[in-house]
Amino acid sequence: MAKLTKKQKEAASKIEKNKLYSLKDAAALLKVVASAKFDESVDIAVRLGVDPRKANQMVRGVVTLPHGTGKDVKVLALVTPDKEAEAREAGADHVGLDDYLQKIKDGWTDVDVIITMPAVMGKLGPLGRILGPRGLMPNPKTGTVTMDVAKAVQEVKAGKIDFKVDKTGIVHAGIGKVSFGAEQIVDNAHEIIQTLIKLKPTAAKGTYIKGIHLTSTMSPAIALDPKAV
């Protein structure tokens, strides 16, 4: 395990071991312990009482963060020529179809989100082995396969993110930057937690929200009290 730097040790010393913080206190503390010279990303990890191996306990969805992610999301719109102007006006960074499909086949994946149309999905099938592992495959459930391309692009640019429970039962999501105000971090975290609660599978038994941790790129994790969020 890598040794902690002096700054990381100082940060860790400010977080009480075995203490469960309220969301408000955790957000304020996170801004204190963040020590990197760059604007660190803020992430949340929510451990759910589900068995993701069972289809009826899979948790996935989308949420629009009230204050966005703080990240400049790069969007590729794979659309037919009649939709290109619409996609560009909405703010897509890359717009086209066959040229970009070839670029992806050649290994290019320098985007954060791909938005496409139902008629184009057939062409994307063979690229699943490239896009799937990178979380870039468009999906109707997350609103990235749609005829309303402009709306989809605008929502992603405004802070709409999709999430999915991993095989260990944890949902990870980026919810902002350390430069955000503490209240903005609280609002964004609260939004995703409430969305997860609404998505609780009926097959999930026992405690649903088992644990929540807030962290920044370089800081130790801060444990939250699930009852105080």
Curated annotation (Swiss-Prot):
One of its GO terms (biological process) is regulation of translation. One of its GO terms (cellular component) is large ribosomal subunit. Signal peptide: none annotated. Keywords: Repressor, Ribonucleoprotein, Ribosomal protein, RNA-binding, rRNA-binding, Translation regulation, tRNA-binding. Pfam families: Ribosomal_L1. Transmembrane segments: none annotated. One of its GO terms (molecular function) is rRNA binding. The keyword Cell membrane does not apply. It comes from the Bacteria. Part of the 50S ribosomal subunit. NCBIfam families: rplA_bact. Binds directly to 23S rRNA. The L1 stalk is quite mobile in the ribosome, and is involved in E site tRNA release. Belongs to the universal ribosomal protein uL1 family. PANTHER family: 54S RIBOSOMAL PROTEIN L1, MITOCHONDRIAL, LARGE RIBOSOMAL SUBUNIT PROTEIN UL1M. This is Large ribosomal subunit protein uL1. It comes from Flavobacterium johnsoniae (strain ATCC 17061 / DSM 2064 / JCM 8514 / BCRC 14874 / CCUG 350202 / NBRC 14942 / NCIMB 11054 / UW101) (Cytophaga johnsonae). The lineage of its organism: Bacteria, Pseudomonadati, Bacteroidota, Flavobacteriia, Flavobacteriales.
